[in-house]
């Protein structure tokens, strides 16, 4: 393996104390599934790896979903989770009316206490980007899991190209890593194998 690891990004990723999974809703899945250029299956596999890892480590997980209405009855009908990605009772769930997760005051309060988080999920060109910008303005540290995220195609641009541009834009406000690098950075380190003396 010949990859070079950016030490600053590695250290920053290891400080993630919350995993935020955005917009893992069936309506978003259905929209992305129609765009053959989106790498939806790979993105969801990486989302599941990040979720399992966070649960194994006891890291808190926040699931967010955008809603079109403030009426709770309408929200529940519009916001079904993708099968297999339903939050557990121990997970936090935040709904937001605008693209940024920070439009939910409770989300803002909790992240303000924690200070750093990793983010991934669907509709990255909207929710992940807006949330990363708001986090940066609040002095919070974000790690974007680029391969555990997917973006929608826009106008005459396919989903893959939009996601490349989205990732570059998020890099202005957050650290961007692969899921594998985040898993390694957040895994417990043991002194096993170290020789002293």
Residue ranges and their predicted role:
Residues 1-18, 52, 72-197:
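Active-site-adjacent betaalpha module
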Residues 15, 33-62:
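A short alpha/beta connector and helix-capping loop motif
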Residues 18-24:
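N-terminal nucleotide-binding beta1-loop-alpha1 segment
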Residues 21, 64, 145:
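Generic enzyme active-site microenvironment
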Residues 25-31:
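Short acidic, Gly/Ser-rich segments with clustered Asp/Glu that frequently serve as metal-coordination loops
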Residues 28, 69-71:
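Short, active-site-adjacent cap segments at secondary-structure transitions
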Residues 55, 66, 140:
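Histidine-centered active-site/metal-ligand motif
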Residues 65-67, 122:
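Short, well-ordered beta-to-alpha junction loops that form the rim of enzyme active sites
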């Amino acid at each position: 393996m010949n990859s070079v690891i950016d030490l600053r990004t590695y250290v920053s990723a290891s400080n993630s104390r919350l995993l935020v999974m955005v917009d893992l809703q069936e309506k978003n899945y259905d929209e992305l599934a129609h765009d053959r250029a989106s790498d939806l299956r790979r993105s969801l596999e990486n989302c599941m790896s990040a979720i399992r890892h966070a649960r194994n480590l006891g890291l808190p997980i926040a699931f967010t979903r955008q809603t079109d209405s403030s009426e709770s009855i309408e929200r529940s009908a519009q916001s079904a989770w993708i099968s297999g990605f339903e939050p557990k009772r121990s997970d936090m769930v935040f709904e937001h009316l605008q693209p940024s997760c920070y439009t939910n005051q409770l989300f803002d309060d909790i992240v303000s206490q924690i200070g750093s988080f990793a983010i991934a999920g669907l509709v990255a060109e909207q929710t992940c980007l807006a949330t990363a910008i708001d986090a940066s303005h609040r002095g919070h540290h974000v790690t974007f899991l680029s391969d555990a995220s997917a973006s929608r195609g826009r106008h005459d641009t396919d989903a893959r190209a939009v996601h490349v541009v989205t990732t570059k834009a998020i890099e202005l406000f957050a650290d961007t890593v692969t899921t594998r690098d985040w898993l390694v950075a957040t895994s417990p380190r043991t002194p096993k194998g170290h020789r002293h003396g």
